[in-house]
């Protein structure tokens, strides 16, 4: 009995995560049943254009329906976000991260991993880009109407990676000299708070088109 207890203690101690090591604990942001982990940007509840069908979050652009960006209740600093998205027809959306609720839209503070019906290596506003700043290096998007698997990773040190369908699309360091040079050469140059929020919300953008999301989960990397 003592021997078994000792072995168990050694196992537990040697498998404890250390500071800075990523956790294996995933928080399920969407369980296929409800939007309890979300609300609207600067609103208490999601717009009623955001619906759930067949365990999928769907933004439906129908007359009389109110959309707006769908935003996480929680705030995140260093994390790995995994999800799948689909454009049922050509359109535009995005995953905006480290969002602060200030004057103006979510993208005034948060960088965006672009969702679009077009993807070409080098396209700064194409799918997978950090919108208008860092283009995807490869094209890995599936056909319109098919699902795409995304991993958005922000590591300590503000090192960001965009992955889609098992391909690394781009990587960069927020706040670096290269980052700042690109921001200063973009439409964001006069947006004082852009990319400066250290811990913020994640938004699924309503850009006026239908977009679907599923299998949304996140884990801390600090």
Regions found by a protein language model. Give the residues of each.
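Sec-dependent N-terminal signal peptides
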Residues: 4-14
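Carbohydrate-interacting regions of secretory-pathway proteins
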Residues: 19-222
């Amino acid at each position: 009995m003592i021997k078994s207890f000792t072995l168990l203690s050694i196992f537990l101690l040697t498998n404890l995560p250390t500071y800075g090591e990523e956790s294996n604990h995933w928080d399920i942001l969407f369980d296929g049943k409800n939007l309890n982990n979300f609300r609207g940007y600067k609103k208490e509840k999601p717009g009623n254009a955001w619906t759930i069908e067949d365990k999928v979050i769907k933004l439906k652009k129908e007359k009389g329906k109110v959309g707006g960006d769908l935003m996480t209740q929680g705030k995140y600093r260093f994390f790995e976000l995994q999800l799948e998205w689909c454009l049922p027809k050509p359109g535009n959306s995005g995953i905006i991260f480290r969002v602060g609720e200030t004057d103006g839209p979510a993208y005034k503070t948060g960088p965006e991993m672009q969702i679009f019906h077009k993807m070409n290596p080098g396209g700064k506003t194409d799918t997978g880009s950090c919108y208008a700043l860092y283009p995807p290096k490869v094209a890995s998007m599936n056909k319109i109407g098919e699902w795409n698997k995304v991993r958005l990773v922000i590591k300590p040190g503000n090192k960001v990676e965009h992955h889609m369908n098992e391909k690394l699309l781009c990587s960069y360091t927020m706040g670096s000299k290269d980052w700042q040079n690109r921001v200063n050469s973009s439409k964001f140059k006069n947006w004082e708070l852009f990319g400066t929020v250290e811990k913020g919300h994640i938004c699924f953008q309503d850009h006026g088109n239908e977009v679907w999301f599923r299998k949304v989960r996140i884990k801390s990397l600090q």
